[in-house]
């Protein structure tokens, strides 16, 4: 099966790896510029090289996986894809435009899936000549087991079942979800991160204290502020804004501190600074401890 992954950023790279590590799948890793697509593939290769150096992966297996991934433009690589998994920027217009272009490129039997973490599948798929389904991976996509499979208003049962079957084939556990803002995981998880930011903003505790409390008191592997940095504070903000817009419920109001940090370009791990500063030696320091 040939899978077109649209978007060669962190999530797109992880999704490409999730398919390429299973024999029988090939991947077209696409972005809007050739160099961006190639950059995504190069980052995958660099990650694999580290695993080989640590003795966690065999070089022959890396070579097989990398040979299964082709990087380029969707116009050049997606015409014969059997499945498209879109992992573009979390913006309705971007996703609608992307799928509109793919609808003219891909063969009629190609399945269209979006990795959106919060947006309406029905709205993204409006105007397409084929159904759209949600196939929501979790970061890191090659290791996290869950895939939320989201049915929009016009998504046929057979499309949902096809995605559940593919998810199982790549070693994932699919959970079927009806369309709703944030689906299941992000409807619960992102407001928790948002509330942790309010607790910090109100001076209830410092960053390390909040994260330590949740790790030790709730048995969470990562504290909420650390997790927000890992996800990306821009993504957390975008999801909170969608939840608030879709529900009108004030409990989903984004914390002003997160909005301020995003405006300042402090998005977390990917920019080197969020609630923590990420040092070259892979340690991190809470920004309020400096």
Describe these PLM feature segments.
Residues 1-50, 54:
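NAD(P)+-binding Rossmann beta1-loop-alpha1 motif at the extreme N-terminus of oxidoreductases
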Residues 6, 24, 157, 161, ...:
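NAD(P)-dependent Rossmann-like dehydrogenase/reductase catalytic/cofactor-binding core
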Residues 10, 35-39, 50-111, 119:
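Rossmann-like NAD(P)-binding element
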Residues 25, 79, 140-150, 221-222, ...:
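Acidic/polar active-site rim loop that often engages polyanionic ligands
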Residues 111-178, 183-187:
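Rossmann-fold dinucleotide-binding core
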């Amino acid at each position: 099966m040939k899978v077109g992954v649209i978007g060669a950023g962190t999530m797109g790279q992880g999704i490409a790896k999730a398919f390429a590590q299973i024999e029988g799948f090939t991947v077209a890793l696409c972005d809007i510029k050739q160099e961006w697509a190639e950059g995504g593939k190069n980052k995958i290769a660099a990650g694999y090289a580290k695993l080989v150096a640590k003795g966690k992966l065999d070089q022959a297996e890396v070579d097989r996986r990398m040979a299964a991934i082709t990087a380029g433009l969707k116009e050049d690589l997606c015409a014969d894809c059997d499945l498209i998994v879109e992992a573009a920027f979390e913006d309705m217009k971007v996703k609608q435009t992307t799928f509109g272009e793919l609808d003219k490129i891909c063969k009629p039997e190609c399945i269209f899936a979006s990795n959106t973490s919060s947006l309406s599948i029905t709205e993204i798929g409006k105007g397409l000549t084929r159904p759209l389904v949600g196939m929501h991976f979790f970061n890191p996509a090659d290791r996290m087991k869950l895939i939320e499979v989201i049915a929009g208003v016009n998504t046929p049962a057979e499309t949902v079942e096809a995605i559940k079957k593919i998810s199982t084939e790549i070693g994932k556990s699919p959970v079927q979800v009806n369309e709703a803002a944030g689906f299941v995981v992000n409807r619960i998880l992102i407001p928790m991160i948002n509330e942790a930011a309010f607790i910090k903003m109100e001076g209830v505790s410092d960053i390390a204290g909040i994260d330590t409390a949740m790790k030790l008191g709730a048995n969470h592997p990562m504290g909420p502020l650390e997790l927000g940095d890992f996800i990306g504070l821009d993504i957390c903000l975008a999801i909170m804004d969608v939840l608030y817009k879709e529900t009108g419920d004030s409990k989903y109001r984004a914390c002003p501190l997160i909005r301020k940090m995003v405006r300042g370009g402090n998005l977390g791990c990917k920019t080197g600074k969020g609630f923590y500063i990420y040092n070259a030696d892979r340690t991190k320091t809470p920004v309020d401890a400096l």
